[in-house]
From Swiss-Prot:
The chain crosses the membrane at residues 315-333, 345-361. Homopentamer. Forms homooligomers. Interacts with MFM1. The lineage of its organism: Eukaryota, Fungi, Dikarya, Ascomycota, Saccharomycotina. This is Magnesium transporter MRS2, mitochondrial. One of its GO terms (biological process) is mitochondrial magnesium ion transmembrane transport.
Length: 470
């Protein structure tokens, strides 16, 4: 029985694959087909974008290009490519030091790193590595810096090959030629910026022009960048002079300790430090001149703006006067009875009244405008009465108040005489005498109290002195 039931149940059982996959859902397939086509289009667009990007070549990422000078100043190799990793291991450098000498066009902070076997230099357009018998000058991708580097090549070749000054070490001669090239580049940049800025400032003294102000703003930004560059180089040289360990490591031919004498190297660095400091001071003074000129120009523009506003207010006041003058004739110009049609003085009186009212309104507005324009810092200060004299309105107000006080005092006395008779004056005099006597009594009492307090203080001091003696 159980077997039969089991067979029937198995025969009635339908596999799940027939239910789910026997009749596929066509909307689901369409939707899936749409999403797949969209994904294919997105992948093709992404593939095109990736193909449009320029890949970094292996030579740029794994090699470094530089020109090498030997101990006699001759060029051994021109723009020779070295593997970066082998170059780092050969000169005992770290991978982080490669950022200082990489031939990228990105400007970074100037640095001079003193290693045990070499000196790594990054100053403006110059990226070099100095050893005791070799100099590596790294190539640049900036076309404007390439011309300056070519000048450096000639200077290095002449400086290192000369045998006149044998007392100076090889590394110091290479360092001096690099400093000379850097200072000459700074000098040319400063002369260019200063000539243009001074010319614009001289032109602005004669005429304030919008185009000149715009040109001055652009050149002031360039001058600020130059000032920051020179300031960084000056601070770098200052740090070198203050650090004895770096000065000792800059001797590669003959090793020295921090306790030795570095007078020759200090004199070399001090010379170019003062020259760089001069460029810093001159550029800073020129920036201050530009700022002061900008402030003066702003003051002039504000004054012109205020004068235009005053002109507009004056025109408005005149317009108001004409409007007031035309109000009354406009009323009488209506085709209605005004009861002065047959009067002989009607026209004259209306015209005179309108003109007088217009003149009165105009004068009053001009007086108020004049009082607003004449502003002082401390108009009511008694110490500055000679510098800031009182206006006629304030003097008239004080005189008016004085007259009112006198009038009130006289009217008070007259009312007292009318109400109380002649005895009022006697009473007033008696009250004044009583008040004076009261004040004198209070004053006398205060003086007596002061004397008593003084005597008591003297007695207390005497007692204290006697107690100390005992």
């Amino acid at each position: 029985m159980n077997r039969r039931l089991l067979v029937r149940s198995i025969s009635c059982f339908q596999p799940l694959s027939r239910i789910t996959f026997g009749r596929p859902n066509t909307p689901f397939l369409r939707k899936y087909a749409d999403t797949s086509t969209a994904a294919n289009t997105n992948s093709t667009i992404l593939r095109k974008q990736l193909l449009s990007l320029k890949p970094i070549s292996a030579s740029d990422s794994l090699f470094i290009s530089c020109t090498v000078f030997n101990s006699k100043g001759n060029i051994i190799s021109m723009s020779e490519k070295f593997p970066k990793w082998s170059f780092l291991t050969e000169h005992s450098l770290f991978p982080r030091d490669l950022r200082k000498i990489d031939n990228s066009s990105i400007d970074i902070i100037p640095t001079i790193m003193c290693k045990p076997n070499c000196i790594v230099i990054n100053l403006l357009h110059i990226k070099a590595l100095i050893e005791r018998d070799k100099v590596y000058v790294f190539d640049t991708t900036n076309p404007s810096a390439a011309a300056k580097l070519s000048v450096l090549m000639y200077d290095l070749e002449s400086k290192l090959s000369s045998t006149k000054n044998n007392s100076q070490f090889y590394e110091h001669r290479a360092l001096e030629s690099i400093f000379i090239n850097v200072m000459s580049a700074l000098e040319t940049d400063f002369k260019l910026h200063s000539q243009i800025c001074i010319q614009i400032l001289n032109d602005l003294e004669n005429e304030v022009n919008r185009l000149k102000l715009r040109h001055l703003l652009i050149k002031s930004k360039d001058l600020t960048l130059f000032y920051q560059k020179t300031l960084l180089i000056r601070d770098l040289l200052d740090e070198l002079l203050e650090n004895d360990d770096d000065l000792a490591n800059m001797y590669l031919t003959v090793k020295k300790s921090p306790k030795d004498n570095f007078s020759d190297l200090e004199m070399l660095i001090e010379t170019y430090y003062t020259q760089c400091d001069e460029y810093v001071q001159q550029s800073e003074s020129l920036i201050q001149d530009i700022k002061s000129t900008e402030e003066i120009v702003n003051i002039i523009l504000d004054a012109n703006r205020n004068s235009l506003m005053l002109l507009e207010l004056k025109v408005t006041i005149y317009t108001l006067g004409f409007t007031v003058a035309s109000v009354l004739p406009a009323f009488y110009g209506m085709n209605l009875k005004n009861f002065i049609e047959e009067s002989e003085w009607g026209f004259t009186s209306v015209a005179v009244f309108s003109i007088v009212s217009a003149l009165y309104i105009t004068k009053k507005n001009f007086n108020s405008l004049r009082s607003v324009t004449k502003m002082t810092m401390y108009p009511n200060s008694p110490a500055n009465s000679s510098v800031y004299p009182k206006t006629s309105a304030s003097i008239a107000l004080t005189n008016k108040l004085k007259r009112r006080r006198k009038w009130w005092k006289s009217t008070k006395q007259r009312l007292g005489v009318l109400l109380y008779g002649s005895s009022y004056t006697n009473k007033a005099n008696l009250s004044n005498n009583k008040i004076n006597k009261g004040f004198s009594k209070v004053k006398k009492f205060n003086m007596e109290n002061d004397i008593k307090n003084k005597q008591n203080r003297d007695m207390i001091w005497k007692w204290l002195i006697e107690d100390k003696k005992n």
